[in-house]
Amino acid sequence: MINEILDNKMSDIRSSGKNVKLESTTMTSVKDLPSWCFIKSRAMLKGDNKPFVVSVLNSSTETPSKGWKCVLFQTNINDKGQLWQLVDGHLLSQLYGSFVLDIDSDNNNGTDLIINSQIPSNNERQTWKLGSNGEIMNNQTKMFIGVKGSNSAPIDPSNNAQLVCESTTSVDNVCFQWDLEPSFPLNSILTQTTEPFPNYTDEKLKAYIYISNNLIKGIDDIRSQYTNSNYSFNSFSNELVNMKYPDSISKDSFDEIKTQLQSEFEQVDSIINLFNNYQQFHIGLFADNSARLNQIVSIIQFDDKTTSVAGSILSIISNILKLVLTFLPQPAGNFGNVMMGAISVSSAASTPNKVNVDPFKVELSKLWDSLSSNFEAILFNMGTMESMILKDWGKMKAVYQLLSTSLAWTPTMTSQLISTGATAYGISLLQMLLPEKYQIYCWNQNFDAKYGFAPGYPAPIPSDIPEYCTWTDENGDVLFIASTSDLRVHPIKEVMDMVWKDNVVVKKDFYRSRNGWSFPTSLVNRITRWLIPNVTNNTSIPMKYTIGDFKGDSKTTYQLDLPTFSTSYPLDVSHNNNGHNYHFTITITNALDNSKIASLVIIVSAVGGSFSKGQLGDHSVTKGYLIGDPIFNTSVRDSTSTCNIIVNIDYNDTN
């Protein structure tokens, strides 16, 4: 059923009646949604089309920390140090730690670029302004990002060339010119002032009507058919070449209209091809009538189809774009410009075709219904966007000018994008489904020494964890994935093979719940009355949170940093109340200005005598943020109970 709906959707949008006077449409606003991008240099090596981008030195092989240098480097698969997000003037790195682009005031006369922790104030040294000629200016120094040694004249780019913030002697120095890819030009085009098509009178109007009637019998206004998919405007352009002017119309008037329409037909045909390419990608990826979802559900072996599953359309689209940026850097920016344009329009659309970019929670049996309705809405609004462009001369010209650059979509791109997109879509489904059945368990090597328990009291690591289900971090902590009800029951190899396929998923992200993964994490020990609260920051805003106000113990407080797109949890929640029934309060704040984001009371109760489980008590959330239903998992033998609280931006509650 959905295949038929999707196949017909674009043609439904394009169809229009005869002799309809076109009315241009302009969106009053388009929702700007967060997205990762490359900062691509306009400097290229001769004979080498692989772009150079702003990168963090050695970030693909080591774990960077604040103060690490920023360098020029060609795009490198799975290097998070090459992806950035523009947030309130800051250039936020995808690397763990809430790092932003900054200037090293202590080295090279204070011009070297580094990553640094975001300063908790309005510090202009860490904010940047994008110029119209590709320049990126620092708001404090008024200098520009460039390649070291090139301020007087461009030099050949090279890997690991130091990036600086300096002045340049030429505004056209390619070593000081950059492009964000994707750059989302459709957002501004769709909101630009309407520009009508050229209007004609007298002989020119006669020529226009004559040509229209000769191309389509009974049609006096050929432009009214630009959104009609029944016609080939490339064929019309060929017909115009040999069309003779009538005696009743001057040759000059006829030739002027003919030349204008040939130009318009070329633009219409090219724009329709762009949207057809997206349609083919969209249908090729999403119109599987739930086959991919059903396959993953079957492999994970869900027994209860009433299980609640949390999901997000925005996360799916972001994963697709991130993976395309990683594996297909050449067409990625252009693809992202089209796809994110569709999402921006869809999230700003009016019902019933609005896409809800906020997280949702549904029963597993209804997950496909939620996904497919949003996929349909995206495609519908893509058609609406195409129609808006084809009805407006200004928008048509603006889009056409970009078809050879930032909106270029070559014939070979579609199959590559579908293949890479399918991998990302599968990962998104795993991110939704796995936390409903499994959680991460953490065995901390210092736990017994810290608490001074007698030998044998701390729970041992299970001896038979499959290799594909475990990872040891740089501190010696052992993390593994297992059932929420038994730490000795693990996902089957077929499930984990999907996770680790093509090395797309970074193990540290998976086991530490970062960049889209959000498992509850339980500690391996025998204090089963403990509940370990996990908080996931699914935003570009650095946060922190405190755990305190324990029943019977008002003095014990824990404070944790909560970097962007990551999860934090304490390695203990010991307090003076030794019972199984207690409560505590979690307070989440913005790390930059200390404003409160949310406050939640967690109530912990005894289960089965020696175990515990939490539930959500009184809570409040600041306008502009969302906290869905937290996951609460009961403690099991040799491990603590746990919960996971996920903080998201409420995009329906922001401008």
UniProtKB/Swiss-Prot annotation:
Belongs to the cup family. InterPro entries: Ca_Up-reg_Membrane_Reg, Ricin_B-like_lectins. Gene3D superfamilies: 2.80.10.50. It comes from the Eukaryota. Residues 40-181 form the Ricin B-type lectin domain. This is Putative calcium up-regulated protein J. GO terms for molecular function: carbohydrate binding. Keywords: Lectin. Transmembrane segments: none annotated.
